[in-house]
Every structure is written in structure tokens, then in C-alpha cells.
């Protein structure tokens, strides 16, 4: 019998999962984290991605999280996320449509945003050069 611990995955709206597991994997800000019973206490930010947990019978389940926090305590691991969706509830067509929309928006706005930022920085540089040349002429 594998050692188990309680896992709680909570979104801003509801508790997505609460039960006993033998392991959980998430992507922290510094890389992949694997948590097993007896893990050292930990509090860290997690990146958007997958929470993968293994039940005592060996069955693996998956939850998408939009990022958030992972807290590891001696007997319970808690994942707090703004958005958490069970893997089986994800809709591929909706995801692909949202991905395409985001890519289109990024490609349209990215160039304009970069151009505007570059223009602002060039303008700052010009002001800096003018101010410094006038100060140099006063000396």
C-alpha cells in the first residue's frame, strides 16, 4: 500500500478535487515539482499548465490550471488557481478557436505595440541627447 496524502485543488469558483493521492506533479516557477507523502513543506508559485495526480489504484488524473500557488504541508497539498478545469471537461474545439484568436490578436497588436514602444524610446533618447547637449554647452 503506497503512502498517500490529501490533495485539494481549488479555483476561484469552486473546489475541483479533494481526495487522497499518492503523488502530484505541477510546474513551478523553477521547473517541474513532484510531491509524494512526507515531502518537505513548501509554498511556491506555479505556472499555467497541468496538475497530474495519481490515485492509490494507480489511475492518473489531470487538471488544467491557469497558474497560482502550491502549498505543501505534512498531510495536505493545496493547489490554488484562478482557473482550474478537469482534463475531461476541456473542449478541444473551443481551445483551438481561443488559441487562433489569441495568435491573431498577438500578431496584429504585437507589431504595433513594439513600434509604439520603439517610438517612445527613440523620443526619450532624443530628449536625453538634447538636454545633455544643452547642459554641456552651458559648462
From Swiss-Prot:
It is found in: Cell inner membrane. Gene3D superfamilies: F0F1 ATP synthase delta/epsilon subunit, N-terminal. The keyword Acetylation does not apply. Keywords: ATP synthesis, Cell inner membrane, Cell membrane, CF(1), Hydrogen ion transport, Ion transport, Membrane, Transport. It is a peripheral membrane protein. One of its GO terms (cellular component) is proton-transporting ATP synthase complex. One of its GO terms (molecular function) is ATP binding. Signal peptide: none annotated. Belongs to the ATPase epsilon chain family. F-type ATPases have 2 components, CF(1) - the catalytic core - and CF(0) - the membrane proton channel. CF(1) has five subunits: alpha(3), beta(3), gamma(1), delta(1), epsilon(1). CF(0) has three main subunits: a, b and c. This is ATP synthase epsilon chain. It comes from Actinobacillus pleuropneumoniae serotype 3 (strain JL03). The lineage of its organism: Bacteria, Pseudomonadati, Pseudomonadota, Gammaproteobacteria, Pasteurellales.
